[in-house]
A protein has these predicted regions:
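Short, basic/aromatic-enriched C-terminal tail that caps enzymatic domains
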Residues: 91-103
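Helical "substrate-binding/catalytic lid" subdomain
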Residues: 1-92
Length: 103
């Protein structure tokens, strides 16, 4: 939960600097509404499925945070995670291709 708190701290701090704190707080609250188990599964599945696109999105977000003069520690960590997911997917694809060639 400490990592989740760090995401909220970084996000709300940036939103405050950008003049859209109220909007972002509502967006975060809306994400937490509903079925928490489904949210966790959606985050896991969606991160793996869309890692390439999300890596680019968080890179753009990091640049924006830098432009605001705000820390981007969590955003940088998210970028590393999406890169890791891409590497894992590429390794799995390579293994599947290799296995298919042996069959």
């Amino acid at each position: 939960m400490k990592g989740l708190a760090a995401v909220v701290l970084e996000s709300v701090g940036a939103a405050e600097a950008a003049g859209c704190e109220t909007w972002l707080r509502a967006q975060i609250a809306a994400e937490f509404a509903g079925d928490p188990g489904a949210l966790v599964q959606r985050l896991l599945d969606g991160s793996r499925q869309h890692a390439g696109r999300r890596a680019h999105e968080v890179e753009d977000a990091r640049d924006y945070l830098d432009g605001l003069g705000r820390p981007s520690w969590v955003t940088s960590a998210a970028h590393r995670w999406f890169g890791q997911l891409l590497e894992e997917a590429a390794a799995a694809d390579h293994a599947a291709d290799h296995e298919g060639a042996r069959a």
